[in-house]
């Protein structure tokens, strides 16, 4: 394969102290802020202070410990991280590894991706709100900083708005502080938990899974199986951990996770000890938004802890926002979503900004804050969607293990074991549907509907148009040669480029040749037919060329990774210079130019736009899908922007999209006398 492009292959992530700090700031934001609300949700669900005993607390932290161990450590850290696509992780990267096994696997990939995006909209709202609620009642110089929930809402809205506003400028500068701050945060979690745990080491008996299982059937547990809906909040960040692997590397996650896990477990156990020792203090029930995380801290450090928690919540939110951009970008490259305008605000690999996604996330967060108002209400909706994502990931992991020829007993055992556990979590979280979960379910359904329309609509179009009239470039080689040398036609451009798909090396849609020869003969020195092939590897940057034995026709096949910018204009200029250097194309010296000794002429790109033809003859449902897909194109970025042609000379031409078998109506020619003999329509 000829390759003149500099391949931006995956970076080999070195394991260093700096890299481990970056990992703490990028990967663990979501799971690292869970101690802010997990025990709070468990206690509130059981009736509040005074409505639980020691066995209840032991069973609760036992469930948390084993959930973190089984779901986060075993499934994601030990198994899923090995299912990487050239270093990239996440449900879409996993899908690209297995999609050749069965066409239907696109469904779990889309369902899981839609649910993950929906749940990500709730994370910034719930984490920041929980942190700010800790300021209620806190005195500074004798004054109460925040004394009501309305003030909490406004402060949260200001923080969220600021966070989304700065996305357009890139987060490289503040991102450098994320790692150290999260290191301090996790250390604080561990130390605070250890101090509280040291007052009653007997809480460590919760490491025995017996207490976890016993709690599920204990009469002390007023929630029954549904307590798992709160327990699950401790591991919601596991999917994000897998998705962010490409930013930091598997090795850095392997080394940093034990420290993070220990700090989290210590804090959960410490909160349980404090709750056990203060369970009879019913006065705590009078505290609005009672949170054991903050209450177990000495009054002297509580304000500092709240500030640190707020910073951690902001970092967690930033990680979810960046993760959403990456997820949408991958969905676009996989043709699950329309092409959207993507901006790369810094030179940092993988850092991108999608304006329309940023606006939607911001408005969704504000709507969620305004609708639910308190973190307790948000917790009721949180986690439902992510259980669906985890189930879909388990299904794809099974397919991955089978594709790697893992023993059937291991692959099937993995599927059954994790599916059973996650199904129980899903059932226990289903009650959240009535308590706000319908919000994330509705958002996930809308995202899934858009994905389905775009993906299935594209499939309908491809299935119906691949049989469309195709033409061989060989059959028109002579005409193109004559046209480029015909003095009767003015030179249209030096290099004429069509973005297309070439089948069997030399067949293209006849509408392209119609554009060149019939619509308006376009005389050029070189005719370029460019195909962009998105590969399953994230950072492929390669190409092939075929001139068909001429020096005026070039078939360019670009192979770009699903995370690569499609800067066709830039790539073509390198390709033409490579070909001239190899003697495959003659130079194109320019008489008038600002560039000394310029050897490449001007370029014109012809972009063909499709509009559904009235002649389309397909089933009603399929036609509705196609029409919906064409409407979605209005929110999509223009082909010129998508292919990096914003500053190039582009020509837009509209072509009819005809699907299905075209009915042919034959007219009968009448003589004048026959026409005069036709009965005339009478006026009403």
UniProtKB/Swiss-Prot annotation:
The keyword Membrane applies. It catalyses: K(+)(in) + H(+)(in) = K(+)(out) + H(+)(out). GO terms for molecular function: potassium ion transmembrane transporter activity; symporter activity. It comes from the Bacteria. One of its GO terms (cellular component) is plasma membrane. Its main location: membrane. The chain crosses the membrane at residues 19-39, 61-81, 104-124, 151-171, 177-197, 223-243, 255-275, 303-323, 352-372, 381-401, 407-427, 433-453. Pfam families: K_trans, K_trans_C. InterPro entries: K+_transporter (IPR003855), K_trans_C (IPR053952), K_trans_N (IPR053951), Kup (IPR023051). It is found in: Cell membrane. Keywords: Cell membrane, Ion transport, Membrane, Potassium, Potassium transport, Symport, Transmembrane, Transmembrane helix, Transport. The keyword Coiled coil does not apply. It is a multi-pass membrane protein. Transport of potassium into the cell. Likely operates as a K(+):H(+) symporter. HAMAP family: Kup. Belongs to the HAK/KUP transporter (TC 2.A.72) family. This is Probable potassium transport system protein Kup. It comes from Lacticaseibacillus casei (strain BL23) (Lactobacillus casei).
């Amino acid at each position: 394969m000829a390759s003149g492009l500099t391949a931006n292959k995956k970076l080999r992530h070195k394991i260093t102290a700096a890299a481990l700090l970056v990992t703490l700031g990028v990967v663990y934001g979501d799971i690292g802020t869970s101690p802010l609300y997990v025990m709070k949700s468990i206690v509130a669900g059981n009736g509040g202070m005074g409505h639980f005993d020691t066995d209840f607390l032991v069973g609760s932290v036992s469930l948390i410990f084993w959930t973190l161990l089984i779901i986060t450590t075993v499934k994601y850290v030990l198994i899923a991280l090995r299912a990487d696509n050239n270093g990239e992780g996440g449900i879409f990267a996993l899908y690209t590894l297995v999609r050749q096994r069965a066409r239907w696997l696109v469904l779990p990939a889309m369902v899981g991706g839609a649910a993950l995006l929906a749940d990500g909209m709730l994370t910034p709202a719930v984490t920041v709100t929980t942190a700010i609620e800790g300021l209620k009642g806190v005195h500074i110089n004798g004054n109460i900083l925040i004394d009501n929930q309305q003030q909490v809402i406004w402060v949260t809205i200001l923080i969220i708005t600021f966070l989304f506003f700065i996305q357009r400028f890139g987060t490289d500068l503040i991102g450098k502080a994320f790692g150290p701050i999260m290191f301090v945060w996790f250390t604080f979690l561990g130390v605070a938990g250890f101090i509280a745990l040291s007052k009653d080491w007997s809480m460590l008996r919760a490491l025995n899974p017996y207490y976890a299982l016993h709690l599920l059937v204990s009469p002390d547990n007023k929630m029954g199986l549904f307590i798992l809906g709160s327990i699950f909040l401790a591991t919601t960040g596991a999917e994000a951990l897998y998705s962010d692997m490409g930013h930091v590397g598997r090795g850095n996650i392997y080394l940093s996770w034990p420290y993070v896990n220990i700090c989290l477990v210590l804090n959960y156990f410490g909160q349980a000890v404090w709750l056990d020792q203060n369970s009879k203090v019913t006065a705590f029930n009078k505290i609005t938004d009672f949170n054991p995380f903050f209450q177990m801290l000495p009054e002297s450090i509580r304000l500092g802890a709240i500030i640190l928690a707020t910073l951690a919540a902001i970092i967690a939110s930033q990680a979810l926002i960046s993760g959403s951009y990456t997820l949408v970008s991958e969905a676009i490259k996989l043709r699950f979503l329309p092409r959207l305008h993507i901006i790369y605000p810094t030179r940092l690999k993988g850092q991108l900004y999608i304006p329309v996604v940023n606006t939607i996330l911001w408005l969704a967060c504000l709507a969620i804050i305004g609708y639910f108002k308190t973190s307790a209400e948000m917790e009721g909706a949180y986690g439902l969607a992510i259980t669906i994502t985890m189930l879909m990931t388990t299904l794809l992991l099974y397919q991955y293990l089978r594709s790697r020829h893992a023993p059937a007993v291991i692959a099937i055992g993995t599927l059954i074991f994790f599916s059973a556990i996650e199904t129980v979590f899903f059932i226990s979280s289903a009650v959240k549907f009535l308590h706000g979960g319908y919000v994330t379910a509705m958002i996930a359904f809308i995202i899934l509907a858009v994905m389905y329309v775009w993906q299935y609509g594209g499939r309908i179009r491809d299935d119906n148009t691949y049989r469309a009239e195709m033409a061989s470039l060989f059959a028109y080689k002579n005409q193109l040669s004559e046209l480029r040398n015909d003095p009767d036609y003015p030179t249209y451009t030096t290099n004429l480029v069509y973005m297309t798909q070439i089948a069997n090396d030399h067949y293209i849609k006849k509408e392209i040749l119609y554009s060149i020869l019939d619509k308006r003969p376009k005389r050029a020195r070189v005719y370029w037919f460019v195909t962009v092939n998105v590969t399953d590897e994230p950072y492929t940057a390669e190409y092939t060329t075929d001139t068909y034995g001429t020096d005026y026709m070039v078939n360019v096949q670009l192979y770009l990774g699903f995370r690569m910018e499609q800067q066709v204009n830039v790539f073509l200029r390198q390709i033409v210079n490579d070909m001239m250097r190899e003697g495959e194309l003659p130079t194109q010296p320019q008489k008038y130019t600002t560039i000394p000794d310029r050897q490449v002429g001007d370029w014109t790109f012809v972009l063909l736009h499709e509009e559904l033809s009235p002649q389309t003859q397909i089933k009603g449902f399929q036609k509705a899908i196609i029409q919906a897909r064409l409407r979605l194109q209005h929110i999509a970025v223009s082909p010129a922007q998508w292919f990096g042609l914003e500053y190039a000379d582009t020509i837009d031409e509209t072509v009819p999209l005809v699907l299905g078998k075209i009915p042919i109506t034959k007219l009968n020619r009448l003589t004048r006398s026959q026409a005069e003999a036709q009965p005339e329509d009478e006026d009403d």
